[in-house]
A protein has these predicted regions:
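Solenoid-like repeat scaffolds
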Residues: 1, 29-36, 65-70
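Structural detector for internal amphipathic alpha-helices that build alpha-solenoid repeat scaffolds
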Residues: 6-20, 29, 39-53, 71-87
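Buried hydrophobic core positions in alpha-solenoid tandem helical repeats
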Residues: 26-28, 59-61
Length: 87
């Protein structure tokens, strides 16, 4: 259905305009999908935070805890998670 992981993110962004709840589910699925590239997962988590900050916390945590994710991306996810904790 999608040619790339970025296409999935693009589709979720378009969905956010019409159905934020469905977009949040899509962003969460992308962010938690270990088959998706690290940067795309982080991007999905960041976009999820814009749509539903509470739902972004588990997504950021999943990225931060994933030992297969690069250190910089894991650190960014942890920083985003810390920022969400202040909401």
């Amino acid at each position: 259905m999608y040619e790339s992981d970025e296409d999935r993110v693009d589709a979720a962004e378009q969905l956010a305009e019409h159905n934020p709840h469905a977009a949040a589910e899509a962003f969460s699925a992308i962010a938690c999908d270990q088959a998706v590239g690290d940067e795309v997962r982080l991007s999905a988590a960041e976009l999820l935070a814009d749509v539903d900050p509470r739902a972004a916390a588990p997504a950021c945590l999943a990225i931060a805890r994933d030992g297969t994710v690069g250190d910089e991306v894991r650190r960014s996810a942890a920083e985003r998670l810390a920022g969400l904790a202040t909401l």
